[in-house]
Amino acid sequence: CFPGNCPDS
């Protein structure tokens, strides 16, 4: 994922 774009799950 990208910085600040990663899913919480």
Swiss-Prot record:
The record marks P3 as: Aromatic residue important for selectivity towards vasopressin receptors. One of its GO terms (molecular function) is toxin activity. It is found in: Secreted. Expressed by the venom duct. The keyword Disulfide bond applies. The modification Serine amide is found at S9. It is unsure whether Ser-9 is amidated or not, it is why the two forms have been synthesized. The non-amidated form shows a very weak agonist activity on the zebrafish vasopressin receptor 1Ab (V1a1R) (EC(50)=117 uM). The state of the C-terminal residue does not impact its 3D-structure. It comes from Conus miliaris (Thousand-spot cone). The record marks D8 as: Non-basic residue surely responsible of very weak activity. Shows reduced activity on vasopressin-oxytocin related receptors. Is more active on fish receptors, than on their human counterpart, supporting an evolved role of this conopressin in the envenomation process. Shows weak agonist activity on the zebrafish vasopressin receptor 1Ab (V1a1R) (EC(50)=13.6 uM). Also has weaker agonist activity on the human vasopressin receptor AVPR1B (EC(50)=38.2 uM). Has no effect on all other receptors tested. The keyword Disulfide bond applies. Keywords: Amidation, Disulfide bond, G-protein coupled receptor impairing toxin, Secreted, Toxin. This is Conopressin-M1. Its main location: secreted. Disulfide bonds join C1-C6. It comes from the Eukaryota. Signal peptide: none annotated.
